[in-house]
Amino acid sequence: MIKKPVIGISGCLAGSAVRFDGGHKRADFLMDKLVEWVTFRPVCPEMAIGLPVPRPALRLVRSTQGNIRMCFSYDQNEDVTERMTEFSRSYMDKLKDVSGFVVCAKSPSCGMERVRVYDENGNRGRKDGVGLFTSTLMEKFSWLPVEEDGRLHDPVLRENFVERVFALHELNHLYKEKLSRRELLAFHSRYKLQLLAHSQAGYKDMGPFVAAIHEWADLESYFEVYRDKLMAILRKPASRKNHTNVLMHIQGYFSNYLST
């Protein structure tokens, strides 16, 4: 039996009172509903580097050279960039079995996008930053489903995230337990119409690549490329138009057996 998928999660979203103000941002959908089907692995990067609760707020600061640093908001000379970077890199080794990650929006450590970045004079800059921990996460595991808590309120993005988590979980199980060309082809056969629902171009691109599986001497290298392609296609939410196209394909399979 395949175990439940493991999803990493910012500790505050799991309900732990680890935020700078001593509070939390418990994500009800995750902790009340999705928790039945997955195993969450919480982490608070800011506490992991030794910061207390409560603590002064942190912010991202862009230097005149363009480098991003993490500093305390009350004193930008108090820099914790190196500590956060060192922890983030070391923690990646603990995430080899995860199938997804949910991070806290707007956080200088965990934000996935649109995190406020200040200049060296303390002026509010553009919302174009990524939290230091999440930046390392997405760079190390580019194929991993990563979402912010706020975006999961959108039913389309929520469905897409959960779908990707379970697809990657099944693929990872195949890799660990029974990786072979036959099993990988069987996996693709099960998922190809699902890929079509997400991207017609991606579906067509995968065809020749899958057909060439026997030309690869190193199956593990092939698997890594296949995984990247699969997850890139699934990252694009399925559309009504593509769902209709999938149904037309399915109808074609049965057309010879159906009366007019």
Task: Map each language-model feature to its residues.
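Short beta-strand segments
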Residues: 10-11, 44, 101-106
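Internal, conserved structured core segments that host functional sites
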Residues: 89-167
